Amino acid sequence: AVCVSLLGASSIRPLPLHLGQFNNMIKCTIPGSTPWWDFSDYGCYCGYGGSGTPVDQLDRCCQTHDNCYTEAQKFSGCSPYRRKYSYECSEGTLTCKSDNDECAAFVCNCDRLAAICFAGAPYNSNNVDIDLEARCQ
């Protein structure tokens, strides 16, 4: 069983630094969660890409986050998927630090608002790994 576990773990791609930060922001607002597993294949917008009508409130959080990243890309040289930023988590409260440049501050705020949104949205396991072609038009 240990070998299977180790082999399974070796096939998981590591998160880029910034997405690791987003992952940790979600853990701050939802203690005990496993964001990469819980949200990476949820609804029409949580995970890579996105299209159609969000299936619920949580999926709308992801759509808003996607749109925020699109806005971040309008800053010269700003790549939200790779941008490192400074933030603080204190007792479930997220704060983007003032030493971030314009791009980092924007991306940090995208992630902060999404993490807060996730924490306030119900999680419906029926919306995990859905048929994107049928439900996301």
Curated annotation (Swiss-Prot):
A Gene Ontology MF term for this entry?
phospholipid binding
Q: Where does the record say this protein resides?
A: Secreted
Presence of the UniProt keyword Cell inner membrane in the record: no
GO:BP terms for this protein? arachidonate secretion; lipid catabolic process; phospholipid metabolic process
Q: What is its EC number?
A: 3.1.1.4
Q: Which UniProt keywords are present, listed alphabetically?
A: Calcium, Disulfide bond, Hemostasis impairing toxin, Hydrolase, Lipid degradation, Lipid metabolism, Metal-binding, Secreted, Signal, Toxin
Q: Which CDD domains match?
A: PLA2c (cd00125)
Family annotation (PANTHER family): PHOSPHOLIPASE A2 (PTHR11716:SF94), PHOSPHOLIPASE A2 FAMILY MEMBER (PTHR11716)
Name recorded for this polypeptide: Acidic phospholipase A2 PL-II
Q: Which organism is it from?
A: Walterinnesia aegyptia (Desert black snake)
